[in-house]
Amino acid sequence: MILTSFMLMMIATTFTLYLASTPIVLGVNILMMALLLASTFASFMSSWFAFLIFLIYIGGMLVMFAYFLALTPNQQISNFNIMPYALITLLTFSALTYTTNIKIPTFSDISQGNSILYMSSTAPFLILLALILLLTMVIVVKLTSRSSGPLRPFSP
């Protein structure tokens, strides 16, 4: 049950990535995703592996965060409206809790090796992870706005 709630929280934070208007809000959102991912790994793998994943994830995020801060002007976070975040979280929890039959692998299932990944009972879990990655990629492409060219122009 805890792994299901972690996955639902990761989905909700993925959906709220697009609502981030400033780099600070985006950084906090990605930090929450890193904490959820590390806690998920710590719950059914080793805590050392979760710690390493967290450090790698945060290190990459800090580089990107510093780059975006250098490109964007200082913006004030004003009129922060929590309603879109709450609505997306509520819809995600209610839809996935009542309509799906996702089996999250337990520690005893993991001892079977990599064959657990290809079982039919874990197919919705893999599709869900792939959709999270796809949605994150689309959000990053939308935020960088391809039509405006490169983030930093090349100057020889």
From Swiss-Prot:
Any GO MF annotation of the entry: NADH dehydrogenase (ubiquinone) activity
Top-level taxon in the UniProt lineage: Eukaryota
Cellular-component GO terms for this entry: mitochondrial membrane
Keywords (A to Z) from UniProt: Electron transport, Membrane, Mitochondrion, NAD, Respiratory chain, Translocase, Transmembrane, Transmembrane helix, Transport, Ubiquinone
EC number, as in UniProt: 7.1.1.2
Keyword Zinc: no
Residue intervals passing through the bilayer: 1-21, 24-44, 49-69, 77-97, 121-141
Position of the signal peptide: none
Disulfide cysteine pairs (residue numbers): none
Reaction catalyzed: a ubiquinone + NADH + 5 H(+)(in) = a ubiquinol + NAD(+) + 4 H(+)(out)
Main localization of the protein described in the UniProt heading: mitochondrion
Membrane topology listed for this record: Multi-pass membrane protein
Compartments where found: Mitochondrion membrane
Its job: Core subunit of the mitochondrial membrane respiratory chain NADH dehydrogenase (Complex I) that is believed to belong to the minimal assembly required for catalysis. Complex I functions in the transfer of electrons from NADH to the respiratory chain. The immediate electron acceptor for the enzyme is believed to be ubiquinone.
Similarity remark: Belongs to the complex I subunit 6 family.
Protein name: NADH-ubiquinone oxidoreductase chain 6
